[in-house]
Amino acid sequence: MKIRQINHIVCVVVIYTMVAIAVTYFFCFYISPMWNEFGGDQSMFSIIGEGWKLGRVPYIDLWDSKGPIIFFVNMLGHSIAPGEIGICILQVLNIASVLILSHYFLSRCASVCNVVIFQIIFLLVYVLICSGGNHVGDTTLLLSALVVFLSYKWVLNVSIGIYNHSWKSAFIYGVFVSSCFLSRLTNGAIAISFSVVVVAVLAYNRMWGNLLASVTAFVVGFIVVFLPFAVYFGCHGAFHEMWYAMFSYNLEYAGHSHNLNPHSLKHLLYFISNFCCILFPVLLFVISVILRRRRKINLILALSVLPALCWAINSYAYANYAISYLPILFVSLVETQKLMKWKRVPKYAMSISLLFVVLYIRNYRIYYEGGPDANTRQSLMITKDVPSNETFVAYNVCPTYYIYADRRPCYRFFAT
């Protein structure tokens, strides 16, 4: 490798790391040292992660209705540095890795100027939906980006009659779906749908050997991630607890979660702004049919996002649920450029980007006082004179209390 290439790689890594630091520092306010603010869910993840580091087994000693991946990431964060600093470092590395990966993928499909614009749009949508950072979707964001890029590469080959699917890509799909299974199963909806499309295409073309290799690689990838967690929690007598928290409960939640007013204008605007990444491919397919070009590519992309889109429309899905789907936005932007035959992205693309900034400011206050809410402040005042080695009953206390008070919950259902 030449010195010039090494310098280019170093510059790319440094630039994207600095961008990731800025995004995390200013917008991921629940883990950023800039803000004295903690979210309810993020506090639970952090407390369980710290407890795991200290030897307290999730689900047995500290319980929450999530898969173990998010607790594992928070445990790693607390192992790197105390408090939320370690988690913040992991978030920076996560965002930087996604940007670096997207840089090398998009550079093959678009000019440098367009790559920058696509990444700006991606980041603006991310800060709109990230809800303070350290969410379940963040833990699988990098894998999601890799799966999307590998999938798109295969779709492009299919469009020119090359149907062979790489078993290595199938292995990555399995790793990603397993990671989603161990966090929130609906995060893997696009990958699962795309895998079904791959199976259908290979079966239709009677490529049985390639189909068998891909399915085997997918299963192996799934097992590689799932087995260590299954063995660990099984050895600690917590497998059934883990299974209920990561699968049974979330399946019930997804089945019974319905928006109270799905036809209201407010809900429609909320959905479009937060779930535009999975709405985009369907819109592009309609455009491709009208323009009569790139129809096969956009049909496969639309079929891949359709189940996730139907679920998001019908459920009471929070904005951060879209984080794991967000990398599909990169592919959609590339396809928009190809469909419209733009050499350069029009200037109004930046106007759309500014709209997301306005939406962000509207939904979240960029500058605010921070600190605990009124109930947590009252709880802190009541317990300020209680010695740290004493225990007490904490009824209806927000999990953020334990972080502000620097106390460790004794009861495993501390989040209820």
Say what each PLM segment does:
Residues 108-110, 145-172, 205, 278, ...:
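Membrane-interface transmembrane helices that cradle and orient dolichyl/undecaprenyl
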Residues 131-140, 318-319:
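Short acidic/glycine- and proline-prone juxtamembrane loop motifs at membrane-interface regions
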Residues 166-185, 191-196, 224, 304-313:
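Membrane-interface alpha helices of multi-pass inner-membrane proteins
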